Amino acid sequence: MKTLIVEDNPKKRASLVEYYSSEFPSDDLEVTSALISGLRVARDTKPEFIILDMTLPNYSPDENKGSRIELMPFAGREFVMRVNRMSIKTKVIIVSMFETFGVAPRLITLNSLDAELRDRYPNVFVEAVHYSQAQADWKTAIKNARLSLDR
């Protein structure tokens, strides 16, 4: 199965890749670190499963040409919307280190975001889960989402 991981934090990215590769060693895994490169890879390779961070830069450092890297708090929402528009037959799970996004008065929780994306994009979006090295909830969520694609 083709899988795409879009994550900009090197330690979290390594953790996601290590876990996913150990659970699903026969899957074809692509990894990117920014919104635009992730969308390009999704368009070109049509992955069946996408593990996505919520807060991402628009461009990766090598694409940014020396400009300041600005994080977009709702990049994951944008990604899901665009993948849905591209009609890619995929399932997306968001794995985020943050539990709130944006700034007041537009602050939104991970749970609210999860409900919004499930409602708006039921054919693409699976769930949003909190990432923590100390807890295994994110591992269980990834494993369950991936295994559901085999049914």
Swiss-Prot record:
Superkingdom classification of source: Bacteria
Keywords: Phosphoprotein, Plasmid, Two-component regulatory system
Annotated Gene3D superfamilies: 3.40.50.2300
Family annotation (SMART domains): REC
GO biological process: phosphorelay signal transduction system
Keyword Membrane: no
Domain (Response regulatory): residue spans on this chain: 2-133
Keyword Phosphoprotein in record: yes
Disulfide bonds: none
Modified residues (4-aspartylphosphate): D53
Name recorded for this polypeptide: Uncharacterized protein y4jR
Organism: Sinorhizobium fredii (strain NBRC 101917 / NGR234)
